[in-house]
Amino acid sequence: MKHQTEKPSEKIMRFFTPELYLQFNSPDEAVADRADEAWEKAIHKYQRHLQSIRPKLPSQVKEVAELSLHDAEVLAFEREMQPGFPLSKTPVPFPIWYAFASLSLKQNQTILSLLYILGDHIQEYPAKEDWQFSRSDTHWLYDEVDLDLNHQGMFLHRILFSDGRIFEIPFMSVVVSRFSLPATDEAGTAKRIA
């Protein structure tokens, strides 16, 4: 899939921008304090926005919007696009294709997978040049769920990761799958259940 990078990052995330996150973590106490106030306002604005679109969200999209995945470890992010009906002998007036994305995360002792049926290409935006946080061991920072105003019946999931990248996922549907890892002892050995 093509990765597009034409938007500046503050135009992608509407509420929890990378710029605000950098200011929030500033060593300058005055900057961090101002950012803390701005962050609280962003939380309230996003909650109001989410409340305003909630009646238009199907249950599975509401479930994603209600997840709290901050600091979850990103295990895998797979994307696949396929032609829709390669064996069809009947010509169609427009290209038919389907695409899926799977985002797997570990949060505490739970593995969580978000399985998206995509409505368009996922757009990946690189970290800002001044991104000062680690680019290894990627973790989920903040996300925003929104309506895709350009495509009726579609939704957007924007995610800011700890390496500074932002993904904008246009999707038609999503499934959340969870399973718990076995409990471990202090040495990290899985405890027997039976």
Feature map (PLM): residue ranges:
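Surface-exposed, interaction-prone regions used to assemble/regulate multi-protein complexes
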Residues: 1-194
